[in-house]
C-alpha cells in the first residue's frame, strides 16, 4: 500500500487555551492546516469552526495520538498550560514519534530545560518573553523588539534626528551605533 502524501504545511497544536488557540488561529490565517487538540471538550467545541481539524484527546495517551495520525505531522506545538506532567509527557511522545519540529510552551526556566531534554526543538516562555519585549519598548524609541538569540535582536525604531533626510552613508549610523 502506498504511503499517503501530505503537505508539509501542517501543524498540530496541543492545548487550546489562550496561547494555543491564538497560535492555531494565526497558523490557519497563514494557510496552515491545523489539528487542534485539547482534553477540554468545551475548548475543542469553541474552536471547531475555526481550525482545520479538532479533537478531544488526552495528549499523554500515545495510542490516541497515533490514531489521530499526529506522528505524520511535520510540526507540533505543545501549548499546555499549568499541567507540567502532561506538557512533558506530550513533548516526549512527539519526540518519540519523530516529529521534525516541536515547539513547547514552558512556565519556568526549569520547565524549559526539561522540555528541551525530552525533545522540544524550540521552547518559549510567553510571559517572560513578552515582558522583556515590552520593557524594551517602554524604555525608549523602539516601536518593536524581537530577540532571536542571546546576542541578536531585531528592532523597529524611530530614526534618530541626525539620520532624517540623509542616506545611510551620510548619517554614519553604522559607525555611531555599531549596526
Predicted regions and their residues:
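Cytosolic regulatory regions of ion transport systems
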Residues: 1-179
